[in-house]
Amino acid sequence: MLRTALTTRRCSAGLLAGLLLAGCQPGPSGSSSATPAPATPSASPSPALAATAPGLTPPQRLRLLAGTITAAPADRTIDLPYSYLHTQSWTRATNVITRSDLQRWRRDADYSGREVTRRLPDVRGLAHRPTSDERRQFAAAGTKTTRYVSGDLEPYLPEPLPTDPAELASALAPYELAGEPAYPRMLVHGVIGVATSQYLDRAQRAATLRVLADVPTIGYQGERTDLAGRTGLGFTVSADNSQTQLIIHPSTGEVLSAHEQVHGAKPGLFSYVLILERGHTTTDTRTLSGRP
């Protein structure tokens, strides 16, 4: 399940941080079925135009995007009791790739909720490339429902998420590790972790973009299209024997997908995740389209 994969990844990041900290000196502190309201008109220039203008560095593009992003439809429904998330993910597990479709409803008041998971058979080997055909297969897969009592479905980071970029970066990865080769990877893992675990409002999305702008080795690829056919702005982070690609919505600043390939002794796919839907609902049985 995606929750398990995220928990494992978070624990792995924590272990890595602990091992690295032991060898370095501390540094300075550094919706329901209701029709969503229309998005707020964007400022001029548009986010996409500002971020894709020629001659800009990747950090400049991300900061421009952070300063000009528009409201997402679900920003207007945050008063509803449940945060809803729908993802599809391909994740390395030793020598196989697991394939999962996850729908999650979290009651924000007490962190109770429900998850519905569909799984496809694991794929042996690490050279697997996710395909659109696999996405269609999820619809016919069996479902597993898991219910969580109060306190059992915690978000990646405690709410409310910081909107100060320095504070958010410190929550995602210890500042003391800023000089370590793994630090950029830890930061981008943290950004993916919050994007695939909890709803980010406009200010919080802007903060994550500013965190990415400060990630060493950040690169820009231009427009890219993910496995769900959505086009966004492609950014990459290369660090610690891996390369991670993020595709970001050019108007709202939402992370649409994340794809990590690792190199070294066991090269291949590490993870690929599509964030298909995110928003808020009145119950833990409704989706944004209104279908259960």
Briefly describe each language-model feature range:
Residues 1-16:
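N-terminal export and membrane-targeting signals
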Residues 20-23:
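C-terminal motif of bacterial Sec signal peptides marking the signal peptidase cleavage site
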Residues 25-292:
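Intrinsically disordered, low-complexity prosegments and terminal tails associated
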